[in-house]
């Protein structure tokens, strides 16, 4: 079996895929999130290669049944198709380098490429939103070229500006709000990824796609 299922405290259960992260496995996670339907479930949280469901601790719940249900849905998901009701592709304008991308030069040197080549590699891909987490509107994206996978900073920053575009390991993403963080910051976007006044506060849903485009650069 390619998954493990384990409790998370007394109010949650997680199904985790033991295989490497892939878009195929992530689509199966999304499908489970769409199709698990039990009245006592309070929240469904798709993650990277895993899904967690939380439930009412005061409800008489058969946890063994819920565990078997998650496993059954995982097997069913192999032949099912995920339907994203949004499914949009959004172009995200980015200003690369300079004060807005203080780690661009260091990252390009680490990979022995020019800053221009780094930007080309970063903007060439169409990224898929695997899940939204860490903070409201923060998207974890699949599709970063392995040539620019970059370890997180040894010393995280205490304050990263809103809109900062970063690379952390095999991931790239955008900080929707000012926060501490350890990703390598290569640029910044003015696009608002999360706005509580919108009908749909988060700009992206799992399964959506985005492509970074160059708005400007200081190299």
What function would you assign to each model-found segment?
Residues 1-219:
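Glycine-rich active-site loops that engage anionic ligands at enzyme catalytic sites
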């Amino acid at each position: 079996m390619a998954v493990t299922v384990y409790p998370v405290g007394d109010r949650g259960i997680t199904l985790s895929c033991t295989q490497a992260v892939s878009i195929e496995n992530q689509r199966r996670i999304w499908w489970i999130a769409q199709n698990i339907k039990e009245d006592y479930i309070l929240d469904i949280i798709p993650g990277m290669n895993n899904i967690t469901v939380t439930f009412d601790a005061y409800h008489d719940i058969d946890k063994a049944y819920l565990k078997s249900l998650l496993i059954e849905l995982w097997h069913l998901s192999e032949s099912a198709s995920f339907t994203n009701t949004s499914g949009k592709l959004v172009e995200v304008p980015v200003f690369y380098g300079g004060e807005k991308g203080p780690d661009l030069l260091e990252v390009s040197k680490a990979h022995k490429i020019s800053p221009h080549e780094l930007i080309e590699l970063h903007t060439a891909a169409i990224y898929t939103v695997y899940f939204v987490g860490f903070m409201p509107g923060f998207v974890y994206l699949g599709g970063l070229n392995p040539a620019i996978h970059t370890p997180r900073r040894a010393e995280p920053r205490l304050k990263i500006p809103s809109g900062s575009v970063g690379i952390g390991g095999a991931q790239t993403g955008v900080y929707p709000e000012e926060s501490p963080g350890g990703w390598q910051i290569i640029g910044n976007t003015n696009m608002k990824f999360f706005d509580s006044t919108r009908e749909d506060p988060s700009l992206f849903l799992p399964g959506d796609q985005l492509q970074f485009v160059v708005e400007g650069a200081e190299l």
